[in-house]
Amino acid sequence: MASLLPLLCLCVVAAHLAGARDATPTEEPMATALGLERRSVYTGQPSPALEDWEEASEWTSWFNVDHPGGDGDFESLAAIRFYYGPARVCPRPLALEARTTDWALPSAVGERVHLNPTRGFWCLNREQPRGRRCSNYHVRFRCPLEASWGAWGPWGPCSGSCGPGRRLRRRHCPSPAGDACPGRPLEAQKCVRPRCPGCSLDTCECPDHILLGSVVTPSGQPLLGARVSLRDQPGTVATSDAHGTFRVPGVCADSRANIRAQMDGFSAGEAQAQANGSISVVTIILDKLEKPYLVKHPESRVREAGQNVTFCCKASGTPMPKKYSWFHNGTLLDRRAHGYGAHLELRGLRPDQAGIYHCKAWNEAGAVRSGTARLTVLAPGQPACDPRPREYLIKLPEDCGQPGSGPAYLDVGLCPDTRCPSLAGSSPRCGDASSRCCSVRRLERREIHCPGYVLPVKVVAECGCQKCLPPRGLVRGRVVAADSGEPLRFARILLGQEPIGFTAYQGDFTIEVPPSTQRLVVTFVDPSGEFMDAVRVLPFDPRGAGVYHEVKAMRKKAPVILHTSQSNTIPLGELEDEAPLGELVLPSGAFRRADGKPYSGPVEARVTFVDPRDLTSAASAPSDLRFVDSDGELAPLRTYGMFSVDLRAPGSAEQLQVGPVAVRVAASQIHMPGHVEALKLWSLNPETGLWEEESGFRREGSSGPRVRREERVFLVGNVEIRERRLFNLDVPERRRCFVKVRAYANDKFTPSEQVEGVVVTLVNLEPAPGFSANPRAWGRFDSAVTGPNGACLPAFCDADRPDAYTALVTATLGGEELEPAPSLPRPLPATVGVTQPYLDRLGYRRTDHDDPAFKRNGFRINLAKPRPGDPAEANGPVYPWRSLRECQGAPVTASHFRFARVEADKYEYNVVPFREGTPASWTGDLLAWWPNPQEFRACFLKVKIQGPQEYMVRSHNAGGSHPRTRGQLYGLRDARSVRDPERPGTSAACVEFKCSGMLFDQRQVDRTLVTIMPQGSCRRVAVNGLLRDYLTRHPPPVPAEDPAAFSMLAPLDPLGHNYGVYTVTDQSPRLAKEIAIGRCFDGSSDGFSREMKADAGTAVTFQCREPPAGRPSLFQRLLESPATALGDIRREMSEAAQAQARASGPLRTRRGRVRQ
C-alpha cells in the first residue's frame, strides 16, 4: 500500500485540476481578462502589497502549481492548498490576482481568463484568439486579517417554565465572511426556575425499572472502575466493570435522570438517561485529564497615555480551562477591579501601568503560565520612533578601501525595530487593527569614491512610524531517515492535531507559523509506517526571518511475534557491549482491540527504543523534553530513554491495546545521585509536544532464574498502552542555566557582522566517572535561533562539580555547518570569547582538539554554574536560570561562545541597504534588490572555472530595460569558487544575481543587466547552449561582450539547472538563498548538497591561469587602465587560439590521410 501513496496523491491533485478544467464560466460570477477580481487593474497600474482596502486584509505570496499545456493553465485553489498546505490560503479569499511570468496582466497580453477567489484561476486554450495559447500564470489571493468579536449582548430569558434550564447570549463578528472570528457566536449559562410539581428522584421510586449504562473514552474504550452517581443525589450508586458497563435498579425510566461518572485521571462526565419501556440507557464519555496549554499568548503593545489596550490569553485542555488570572510585573491583578477573564482590558492607560504582563489558566489537572508581553505607555508628546537613525555599518568592497588598512565600513543608518501605537488604540480587539512600526521615512543618495570608480549608496536620513507588514515566522526544511538519509516522501504534516499538508518528493516542507505562537509543535507521519512519528518542537524567528531545519526520522525496529496466551518480555536497548537499560513485560491475556473487546492470537510488535547511550540518537529524539510543573511553567526533563510501542494483528492496520504493562528499569544504569528516587514514566502529548506523567517507579529485586551472584535491582512502573504510543523514562532536573552563543560571518568575529537565523543546538552529556570529555550518555537537548543579540540555550549545570554535566554545542545555517573558535594549542580568551579564569573552569574543547582529522563543527564544555560573588563569572557565558533577561540583553563585549561561517568568502553589497534577518527593515525603492517584501526571489548562476586554484567571481547588477533604472547599480555579489573533490584543477562558484521582474512599484518589468567577472587572468571558453539559445530568443541582446566576462539580460523565467540558473522563491530571503545555493552545488533543480559538483548544471565556463609574480589582478588592472587590460586579454586569447590551432593541425592531417 505504501508504494501506492505517491500515485494516490497525484490522483487527488489531478482531480482538483480536472475540476477546474471542467468548469464553465457561467457557473459562478467571475472576472475575465482582468488581473484582479472586484477591482480592475490595468496595464501600468500598481497592485502593491500594502493597499488601502475597506477590509483589513493582505495579499498571500504568489503560487504557480500548473504550467500551460494541453487544455491551458489551471491554478486551482484546491491544488494550491494540497501542494502548499491549507494554512497558506485563508478559507474564504476576498480577491484573486493573476499575472504572467513576465509580470503582465491578462488584459495586457490579450488573453481571456477566469478568476474566482473561492475556486482559483483557469485559462483555456480554446477560448484564446486564433493562433494564441495561454501564458504561464501565477496567482495570489487577498485574505482578511484575523477578525475579532464585538461585545456580548444581554442574556436571554431562561428556557422552560420550571426546574433547571439555560439562557443564551450572542455576539457579532464584523467580518464579511461571518465565521472568520475564532470562537463561538453563542454562549449558554445554566439557570433555575421554580421546582416543577410532581415526581422527582427524591420522592419517586420505580422498583421494576433498571438503568443500564456504560462508561467509555471518546474512542470507545471501556473504562473499568468509574464511580457512577445521580446528579441530584450524593454517593456512588454503581461502579463500571471490565466492560465499562453498570446497572442501577429503581431509577424511573421517565425521569430523564442526569447520570454522572467520575474516575481518577479523567474529567467528570455527565449524560441524560433515555427511556425505553421499563429500561433506561445512558452512555457517559470521559475524557482523560489534560493539563491546560496555551494556544494564544498575550502580545506586546505600544500605547499612548489615555488610550486603551486589550491583552488576550487562550488555553485549551481537558476539561477546558475557565479560570484565568492576570499578573503585572509579577503581581496578581485584582479580578473584581479589572473584571477580567481570558481577556484583560485596561482603559485610560497611565504611565505606571507600563511593564510586563502575563496570564495563568487553570483546570482540574493543573495550571499553565503564558509568555510575557510588554506594555509601553508613551507620555503625551513622547515620540514612539526617534527620527534620527541609529548606526549601522556595512562593509564596502575590498577594492574600495585604503591599501593595507583592511576593509572599509560605511554607516548607512537603521531605524530601530520597535512598534508604534495603533491609530485605533482604543479598540477592544485582541490584535491591533493595523500594524505600525518604526521604519524608514526618507532615504538620501550618496556616492562613495573608490579607487577607479564611484559606488552609489542610499542611506537612511529619517525614521518615522509607518504602516508595516505584521511579522510572520517561516520554517522550511527537509525530513530524512536518520540511518540512511533517504527523504521521507509524502509524509503527513500535523500542526498540533491539524493536518496542514505533506512533505514533497525530496522530503521538503514549508510551514508558516500561526500568529501568537511560542512553541511550534509539528508531527511528521510516515505513510508507509516504517518510521516513528517524528514529533518536533521547531524553533523559529518570531520577527519574520525564515529558519531551516533538517528533521531526522527514526526507523522502527523489525517486528517480533508475541503470543497473547503467555507473558512476553521485550528488552529496551540493544547497544553492543552494553546491557539493556530495562525491559517491557506484557502479561498474558491483556491485549484488547480498540473497542475494548479481548484479543487472542499472534501480535506483531515493534518496540523502538531511543537509547541516550548512543550519542547519535539525540538528533532523532522526539519533542524537546519539557513538561508543565506545578507552578504552570515549562520545566526540563533529563531522559534515560524513550520507547515507541506499535502493536497490531498480523496483516492488519488496526492497533491493539494492552495493559497494564510493567516497565522495568535496571537501577544499575541510573548513575546520577538522586535520580533513582526521582525517575518517573511519562507519555508524550502529540498535540502540545509536552510530556505528561504516567506513573512513578518502585524498587523490586530480580527473582527466579535472574538471581546471580549479585541480585539485580529493578525500578518498576506500570502503564496502559492505549491512544498514546510514545513513552519516556525521565527525571525532572532543577539545576539549570543558560549558555550564551553568537554566530559571525567569518572567523574575525567582528561585532557588526553577526549572523542571524542560525540554529544552535546544545546536547547535555553525562560524563563517565573520571573522564569529563568521555560522556556516558546524553541527557537532553535544546535548540535556539540566533537573533541580533545571539541566542541563549537552556542546559543542566552544577555549581559544586564543574564536570557534573557537560555539553556538546553545534550550529547550522541551512545545510551549512558553522565552525566554533579553535582550542589548539590552547583556548585563547580573545578568540573563544570567554575571559579567564572562567574559561579554564569551563574546559572549552573544539571537537578536533584531540584529533585534527575530526570535523570542526562543535565544541564541548563543562557546564559550571557561575559562582555568586565572583566578578570573573558574572558576565557570561553561563548564566543562572533566573537570569534569562541578563543573558538575552548582554552586550557583545560580555563573554559568549562563538561560531563562524565556513563559507565566508562571500560579499554582498546593496545600493539600498537591507537586513535579511529583519524583513521589517525593507524599504520601498526602485533600486531595492528585493522588490517585494512578501515574496523574495533568489537567483544564482553556476560558474565553472578551469584553473589551479580557487577564484573570486563578481556579479555586477544594474538596470537593464526599465527607463528609470537603466544603467544604475542595484548591487554587487562576490563568491569564491569551491573545488570539486573529484576533479583536480576544476572549481565552481554559485554567484547570486538580481532576478528580473517587477520593481517595487509593480508598474513595469526590468531585465537586470548582469555581468559576471572572475578575478584573475581568465577568459570565457563556453556558455551553456540552452541558456545561449534562450537569451537569443528573448531580446534585446546585450552589447558587445568582454571576452573576460559574461553578460546577459537576466531571464524572466525560472529556467532551472539545465540552463545553469537556479531560482527559488520564498517568504524569507535567507531561506530562498540557502535553498538555491544547495541546489546550485548539487547541480539539480530539486536536490541539495554542500559538496560542489563542478560539472553539473553550469551556465558559463572560464579558463584561468596564474599571473606572473608581481603582476596585479584583473580587477586592479581594469581599475587602473581598462584599455591596456582589455588589450592584454585579447592578445592572450589570440595566442591561446593560435596554439590550439597548431596543436590540432597535425591531428586533422593524419585523419585525412587515414580516410584516403
From Swiss-Prot:
Organ and tissue specificity: Expressed in articular chondrocytes but not in knee meniscal cartilage cells. Localizes to the intermediate to deep zone of articular cartilage.
PANTHER family reported for this sequence: CARTILAGE INTERMEDIATE LAYER PROTEIN 2, CARTILAGE INTERMEDIATE LAYER PROTEIN CLIP
InterPro entries: CarboxyPept-like_regulatory, CILP-1/2_8th, CILP-1/2_b-sand_dom2, CILP-1/2_C, CILP-1/2_dom, CILP1/CILP2, Ig-like_dom, Ig-like_dom_sf
Ligase as UniProt keyword: no
Leader sequence segment: 1-20
Purpose of the protein: May play a role in cartilage scaffolding.
Region (Disordered): 1134-1156
PTM per Swiss-Prot/TrEMBL: May be cleaved into 2 chains possibly by a furin-like protease upon or preceding secretion.
Disulfide bond residue pairs: C158-C191, C162-C196, C173-C181, C313-C359
Chief site of localization: secreted
Taxonomic source organism: Homo sapiens (Human)
Name this protein carries in UniProt: Cartilage intermediate layer protein 2
Gene Ontology CC: extracellular exosome; extracellular space
Carbohydrate attachment residues: N276, N308, N329
Ig-like C2-type domain segment(s): 292-376
Locations listed in the record: Secreted, Extracellular space, Extracellular matrix
PROSITE patterns: IG_LIKE, TSP1
UniProt entry keywords in alphabetical sequence: Cleavage on pair of basic residues, Disulfide bond, Extracellular matrix, Glycoprotein, Immunoglobulin domain, Secreted, Signal
Lineage: Eukaryota, Metazoa, Chordata, Craniata, Vertebrata
Domain TSP type-1 as annotated: residue spans: 146-197
